[in-house]
Amino acid sequence: MDGLQRCFDQLAWPQADQAAKQLGATLVWPFGACEQHGPQLPLATDALFADRILNSVFEHLDAALPIWRLPVQSIGFSPEHQPFPGTLSLSAELMLQLVDQVGGQLASMGVKRLVLFNAHGGQIGLLQVAARQLRLRCPSMAVLPCFIWSGVDGLQSLLPPAELAHGLHAGQAETSLMLHLAPELVGPSRPVDGAHGSGSIHAPPDGWSLEGAAPCAWLTSDLSETGVIGDARLASIELGSQLEQALISHWTQRFKSLLCSDWPPTKSVVDWPRKS
């Protein structure tokens, strides 16, 4: 399947109507951001990753499968990066409205599933809230918010522990992937900033974290002067290629599993509270 040939916005309206009404019709909406990614990576880093990885995943899917993609949402929720020039951010309220309005229209067309294919870590929680609200309003359509880096097999063997734990932004992983996908967009500076290990002046209190079980609501300026959180000096084209293959393999299997399922379950509405 050619990802470029599965663009929902490039269909004429009769084709779009037919696509949306296919059994199990699934739309994938890639989400990125327009935000600083250190002095070496472009503002569109997350949008580019979501777009390129999704197109590559589509190339590994059977052309007969009822799945299409929407244009990438290239401006997202990025308040943590706003002190840095170039960053553009929508409000949380506007993001919720955006997902609700677009998702509601897709549901009314007959779409069975909407996947929010997100590459920006700063809007994971917000898209989960948006998905839950949309699912409640449109119970006939499944809504699946996902983060492209979550649950990917092989990352632990490809990245050192320090980068897995603290390389959150424009560090080794993102710089390597960009070196592989679009090397012309990578600047010469490869900084390291924010040593957030035990004893660091910028480390969260004991038992708390930047992400994970007990996260802090941090701003990039709390942690870094350059916008990099991690060590971009470790980046390489070879690692970027390995990361791309891990991402493609992971999401190809996830989409195949979804498309072969009957999710969301169909069930009758139960009155609550139940009468004894």
Role assignments for model-derived ranges:
Residues 1-113, 121-276:
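Extended, histidine- and acidic-residue-enriched regions that form the cofactor-binding/catalytic faces
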